[in-house]
From Swiss-Prot:
Belongs to the class-I aminoacyl-tRNA synthetase family. TyrS type 1 subfamily. GO terms for cellular component: cytosol. Keywords: Aminoacyl-tRNA synthetase, ATP-binding, Cytoplasm, Ligase, Nucleotide-binding, Protein biosynthesis, RNA-binding. It comes from Mycoplasma mobile (strain ATCC 43663 / 163K / NCTC 11711) (Mesomycoplasma mobile). ATP binds at K228. The gene is tyrS. Homodimer. The lineage of its organism: Bacteria, Bacillati, Mycoplasmatota, Mycoplasmoidales, Metamycoplasmataceae. This is Tyrosine--tRNA ligase.
Length: 415
C-alpha cells in the first residue's frame, strides 16, 4: 500500500474510500490531491484543521496538494449534513471570507496550489453546465444520494439538489486542468465525492486514474463534535479565538480523547504518539498528554512566541501567582481570552467597593468573608483589611486581577 494511505490508515482517519488501485495509480503518476474549503465563515476552526493536517501529510509524502476554495459554491452552501436550507451569504462577505481562508491555507501550505472555483464558473453559462455536466449524471443516481433522500420529505430546493453536480464539476475541472486525481473531504462528503468520480468516469473513461476518500468525523468520547467550546467554535484566526483560549481548550480535553486528537490534528508519527500516551497513562493527573497536545497544536497554528506567552500566562495565573510579572502583551491576550468586567474606578477607592460594583460577587458580605478567610488576592497582594484602598501595586498594566482561591480569576478593566 502507498505510504500516504498507510499513514492515514495507521492513524485511523479514513472512513470511506473508493477503488484503492485507482488511487495508487493516481499517486504513481504524480497526480495531485485536493480538498474543498467552504468560505461560509471568515476562519477555519479547529475541528476543520483535520483536513489541513491530511494535506500536510500528503505534502510530507511528496504528493502535489491543491486547496479549492468555494468562492462560487459558498454563495449557495453545501447541503451535506444539513437538516434545512442554508441561509445564503452576501457577495461582499463571501469575498472577504474567501480571502481570509486563502491566507490561512497559505500559512500552513505555502507551496499548495489554491484554486477559487468562482474563477472558472464566472465564464460558464447555465446551458454549458447542463451540457457538460448535467448530461452525464442521471436523476435516479442523484436521488439515491443520502443527502437528497434525507431531505425529500422536509423539502430540498433545486439549488441544493444540484449542489453535488457543481462539486462534481469542481473535481472534473481540477482533474483536467490541474492534474488532480484524488479528492478527500469530511465524513459528510462521500456523496459529493462519488458524484465527481462518476462524472470523471463518464467523461474520461473507465481507466481514468481518479479516486476519493472521506475522513472520519472527529468526535469526543461523549459523542459531541470536537472543535467547539461552551463559548462557540475554536477558530484558527487569533482575532476570533486567542492562542490562550485555544491552549486552555486543549489542556481541558479528556484522557479518553487524547489518542484520537493526536492522530487527527497533530503532526506526530504513530510511534511518538503512542510514547506520549504511554507516559501520560503512568500519571494521568499530571496531564502530560494534554500539555503535549496543546504545545504541538498552538505552536503549529500560532508559532513558538505565542506558545511561550500562553505557557507563561498559565504558569502565572494558575501556579506561581506573580500577576505583576505579566507583560503588557500578555495582559492583552488575557483580556481577549477571559470575561472582562468593565467598571469605572480610581486609586483612592476601597477595593471592596470596586469589586462590589463589578458584580462578580453576590454581595459585600461575601467579599468580607473572603477577606476574613484570607481568600482574596488582588494583584499579588492578599487583602486583609475591609478598608484597603486600591494601590498601583494592585494593578497590572492598569488592570485589576482579583483571585478567589487557586482557580477563580476575575478581571476588571477601567471603563
Amino acid at each position: 500500500m502507498n505510504s500516504f494511505l498507510k499513514e492515514l490508515q495507521e492513524k485511523n482517519l479514513i472512513q470511506d474510500i473508493s477503488n484503492i488501485e485507482k488511487i495508487e495509480n493516481s499517486l504513481k503518476n504524480k497526480m495531485g490531491i485536493y480538498v474543498g474549503f467552504d468560505p461560509s465563515a471568515k476562519s477555519i476552526h479547529l475541528g476543520n484543521f483535520v483536513v489541513i493536517n491530511v494535506l500536510l501529510i500528503a505534502k510530507k509524502h511528496r504528493i502535489p496538494t491543491v486547496a479549492l476554495i468555494g468562492g462560487a459554491t459558498g454563495g449557495i452552501g453545501d447541503p451535506s449534513g444539513k437538516k434545512s436550507e442554508r441561509i445564503l451569504i452576501d457577495e461582499d462577505t463571501l469575498k472577504k471570507n474567501t480571502e481570509a481562508i486563502k491566507k490561512q491555507i497559505k500559512h500552513f501550505l505555502p507551496d499548495a496550489k489554491i484554486v477559487n472555483n468562482s474563477d472558472f464558473y464566472k465564464n460558464q453559462s447555465f446551458i454549458d453546465f447542463l451540457r457538460d455536466v448535467g448530461k452525464f449524471i442521471q436523476v435516479s443516481y442523484m436521488l439515491s444520494k443520502e443527502i437528497v433522500k434525507n431531505r425529500l420529505e422536509s423539502g430540498i430546493s433545486f439549488t441544493e439538489f444540484a449542489y453535488s453536480l457543481i462539486q462534481a464539476n469542481d473535481f472534473h475541472y481540477l482533474f483536467k486542468n490541474h492534474n488532480v486525481g484524488i479528492q478527500f473531504g469530511g465524513s459528510d462528503q462521500w456523496g459529493n465525492i462519488t458524484t465527481g468520480l462518476e462524472l470523471i468516469r463518464k467523461r474520461n473513461g473507465e481507466n481514468s486514474f481518479s479516486g476519493g476518500f472521506t475522513i472520519k468525523l472527529l468526535l469526543k468520547s461523549d459523542g459531541t463534535k470536537f472543535g467547539k467550546s461552551e463559548q462557540g467554535a475554536i477558530y484558527l484566526d487569533p482575532s476570533l479565538t486567542s492562542p490562550y483560549t485555544m491552549y486552555q481548550f486543549l489542556l481541558n480535553q479528556n484522557d479518553s480523547d487524547l489518542l484520537n486528537l493526536f492522530n487527527f490534528i497533530s503532526d506526530l508519527g504513530i510511534k511518538e504518539i503512542l510514547e506520549i500516551i504511554t507516559k501520560h497513562s503512568e500519571n494521568p493527573e499530571k496531564r502530560y498528554g494534554q500539555k503535549m497536545l496543546a504545545n504541538n497544536i498552538v505552536n503549529r497554528i500560532h508559532g513558538k512566541n505565542a506558545l511561550n506567552e500562553v505557557e507563561n500566562i498559565s504558569n502565572i495565573l494558575f501556579k506561581n501567582g506573580k500577576i505583576n510579572d505579566l507583560s503588557k502583551s500578555e495582559v492583552s491576550i488575557i483580556i481577549n481570552s477571559f470575561e472582562v468586567n468593565h467598571v469605572n474606578f480610581s486609586n483612592d477607592e476601597k477595593i471592596i467597593d470596586i469589586l462590589d460594583r463589578a458584580k462578580i460577587f453576590k454581595s459585600k458580605n461575601e467579599i468580607r468573608k473572603l477577606i476574613e478567610q484570607k481568600g482574596l488576592v488582588v494583584g499579588a497582594e492578599i487583602i486583609t483589611d475591609f478598608d484597603q484602598i486600591l494601590k498601583d501595586s494592585n494593578l497590572t498594566h492598569g488592570v485589576i486581577f482579583a483571585r478567589q482561591g487557586k482557580k477563580k480569576i476575575f478581571i476588571i478593566k477601567k471603563s
